[in-house]
Amino acid sequence: MEEILKEQNLELGGIQVHYKEAAPAGRQAGQGDALLILHGWGASSESWVLLQRQLCKEGYRVITIDLPGFGRSNSPATVWGVQDYSNFIEQFVQAIGIRQFFLLGHSFGGQIAISFTVQHQELVKKLILCAPAGIRRPPGAREKLLFVFSKILTLVFLAVPSQSLKNRFRAAAYRLMRRSDYFKAEGVMREVMRRVIREDLFSVFSQIRVPTLVVWGDDDRLVPVEDAYVLVREIPHSAVEIISGAGHVPHLKTPEKLSQLVTKFLKA
């Protein structure tokens, strides 16, 4: 089945938003079961084009969005949290005329998808969570040691006169803490990241009532695969699929396998 991929823009709450919509050829705009995909931190709709096309061939209207602050969408004017992004998604689906839809969220996008679904279960027909963030753990010994070391590096760079050397020390400190995304973020988005990584959604998992598929790569080094089993234990109508050989981005590493799992779940 051939598909048509369109890139579009709209303004919501003063923010210019970019999104992509793929629909099977010959189908009128707005027709067909819709699937909305929310990307992870530091990514954009572009990273989902391959999977978007594959799922479109299965007959779905697939929409990927550049969340505010990513890709070609403007950043929010204030420091947003997960709730703000969830509210934004509500405005977005209303603006493009989706009443009920399937929802897929990856990593940070999974955090948003969880928050949105809990509050709008009447809108979400089925939920796919791909290595979602949202579970906070107390730091272990390694993390505590790295935190202390990163603080030392930060103090060292303050005493260095060269700006280029300062940047190197700062980058090293954030990388040690696995916060290179924070280092790369600019302006308000740095504070957005600081806010969202502190948000723990564990207490709301059990409130999800829609059928849910949890997908994880067994080689995920960013969000531990053990979290998958926490989710399926807490979410009433959920199942888990672990993709062998995939890391944190199965939509890029193993797109065919992810497409098969998603399609099977949506058609069940």
Located regions from the model:
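Gly/Ala-rich beta-loop-alpha elbow adjacent to hydrolase catalytic centers
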Residues: 105, 109, 113
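Conserved alpha/beta-hydrolase catalytic His-Asp/Glu region
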Residues: 140, 155-209
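Conserved acidic catalytic loop of the alpha/beta-hydrolase fold
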Residues: 83-101
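Catalytic histidine-centered segment of alpha/beta-hydrolase-like enzymes
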Residues: 246-255
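Short beta-strand/loop motif that positions the catalytic acidic residue
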Residues: 208, 214-216, 220
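Flexible "cap/lid" loop of the alpha/beta hydrolase fold
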Residues: 114-119, 124-157
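Conserved alpha/beta-hydrolase "acid-adjacent" motif
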Residues: 221-227
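Conserved HGGG/HGGXW glycine-rich cap/lid loop of the alpha/beta-hydrolase fold
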Residues: 15, 22-25, 29-72
